[in-house]
Amino acid sequence: MRALALAVVAMAVVAVRGEQCGSQAGGALCPNCLCCSQYGWCGSTSDYCGAGCQSQCSGGCGGGPTPPSSGGGSGVASIISPSLFDQMLLHRNDQACAAKGFYTYDAFVAAANAYPDFATTGDADTCKREVAAFLAQTSHETTGGWPTAPDGPYSWGYCFKEENNGNAPTYCEPKPEWPCAAGKKYYGRGPIQITYNYNYGPAGQAIGSDLLNNPDLVASDATVSFKTAFWFWMTPQSPKPSCHAVITGQWTPSADDQAAGRVPGYGEITNIINGGVECGHGADDKVADRIGFYKRYCDMLGVSYGDNLDCYNQRPYPPS
């Protein structure tokens, strides 16, 4: 009786915690790249990922030809190993790079793990594509490459950590909720080159660091630096969706978006990040550079690019 009772309790827990998927739920995928069992429940053991498994049967985002795990075995660490990280950001520690030694794999993984939906939403290819897109956009923001650079221009991401090596404007706008601190500058720092007090303030609040009073932390603490980039990536700023929602297929364009030519794909992320400068006026070298990084990283992760890579014909979002 006791064994039977425990079995019933265990089944009840599964029933409460499981999320239906597959044919039993209209083809829905499990969250966090879990396997969908033949019975329509999500999990990561052989009961879910073995015989009859309906989707994401590799048991995580690290299926297929993905390089070996670094040992973390979940999330972004199951997609990109330390050695692959070094290959993708091949020259980030070059003597010519101002950020030499700053951007580490451990800081990248630690910051990513603070945002558990990053690289764990959707199927294995979607997870890989998100990693490629994030590293591509941030590589463009921090690039030290040029057309004839050794190993090509797209091997030089993460070369810088501060806009113009710190010789930049203050970037302070009057915002009562995010007041600028005396003597502080809010120029571009970190992988996403976070800029302006109205971004430093909420980013710091979200990650638990007072970046209004200590913006230099983004250029001195690598984990904090990466966290600001993931904050920007994961956070919608209306009317813009989050970059995460776009690359994982969770964003549906509104009527205004459709009228503006904004469509799902990597190009929409460029519009979110810097559309006012780069989008809506035809071919643009900066957009092409972002695409070049993205294609290289997708190729290294063994995943397709998806559609709509540029924003040449997308109208930028209105200023916030």
Swiss-Prot record:
Keyword Disulfide bond found: yes
Gene Ontology terms: biological process: amino sugar metabolic process; cell wall macromolecule catabolic process; chitin catabolic process; defense response to fungus; polysaccharide catabolic process
Annotated SMART domains: ChtBD1
Annotated disulfide bonds: 21-36, 30-42, 33-61, 35-49, 53-57, 97-159, 172-180, 279-311
Tissues in which the UniProt entry reports expression: Expressed at low levels in roots, leaves, sheaths and meristems.
Coiled-coil region: none
One Pfam family this sequence matches: Glyco_hydro_19
InterPro entries per the UniProt record, alphabetical: Chitin-bd_1 (IPR001002), Chitin-binding_1_CS (IPR018371), Endochitinase-like_sf (IPR036861), Glyco_hydro_19 (IPR016283), Glyco_hydro_19_cat (IPR000726), Lysozyme-like_dom_sf (IPR023346)
Residue ranges of every copy of the Chitin-binding type-1 domain listed in the record: 19-59
Signal peptide range: 1-18
Domain of life the protein comes from: Eukaryota
PROSITE patterns reported for this sequence: CHIT_BIND_I_1 (PS00026), CHIT_BIND_I_2 (PS50941), CHITINASE_19_1 (PS00773), CHITINASE_19_2 (PS00774)
Active site, renumbered: 141 (proton donor)
GO molecular function: beta-N-acetylglucosaminidase activity; chitin binding; chitinase activity; endochitinase activity
Family affiliation: Belongs to the glycosyl hydrolase 19 family. Chitinase class I subfamily.
Cited function: Hydrolyzes chitin and plays a role in defense against fungal pathogens containing chitin. Inhibits the growth of T.reesei fungus on plate assay.
Protein name: Chitinase 3
Organism: Oryza sativa subsp. japonica (Rice)
Gene that this sequence comes from: Cht3
